[in-house]
Amino acid sequence: ENIFSELEAVVKNQKNIVWFHCASLGEFEQGKPIIEAYKLNHPTHQILLTFFSASGFEIKKNTALANWVFYLPADTTSNAKKFINLVNPIKVVFIKYEFWFNYMYQLKKQNIPFYSVSTIFREGQVFFKYKWFAKQLKNVTHFFVQDEKSAELLNSIGFSNFTISGDTRFDSVVANTKNPTKIALVELFSKNKKTIICGSTWAKDEMILIQYIKNHPENNYVIAPHELDNISNLQKQSNG
């Protein structure tokens, strides 16, 4: 209830609101280049940014990219109706895995364009096993998927409203290299040597990385695995 009262206080009577939703910080990085480009092309429009997780909200609640930043209330019929009626967005963009069915239904019902961006689908997901879940995707105006496999999966259940646009995190990373944040500890560790940094790695990534490290001992490496329990194992394998 606090979210709704706080939201109403700032968006009431506002116009041209475009709503972006990210689950967490990683999804925000995927959405960031899209928001930046949108603001550049539509300077009079206002950006509402919502998060599901505290990690995303707490770090980005004061971002200059958005006019307002909020948590997204739970995906219930009443919450979806209330939120959308309050915000009255002219278009909505959800990043990657985010499919909130009640919100999607209400957006479709009110003829508000809804875009799923940097989307990635995999075999075994409920959308490709059960008709009810596949039906929910009909509420998406257009999918911008990361890869050909995702496009093939959508096509296999009768969808053609998709574009293969890649992973927008690459756009974000390229932009970050033009204005890098200096980290003293990393600079000290690098000692003017080429340093390769790998973040949120998975087991399959690490198999390739370990072989690469063994073949290129002249470099320094910083690896932050997704599973923290794997740190000691990586240290042993890489002689780190």
Language model features with spans:
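Catalytic donor nucleotide-activated moiety binding site of glycosyltransferases and closely related
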Residues: 223-240
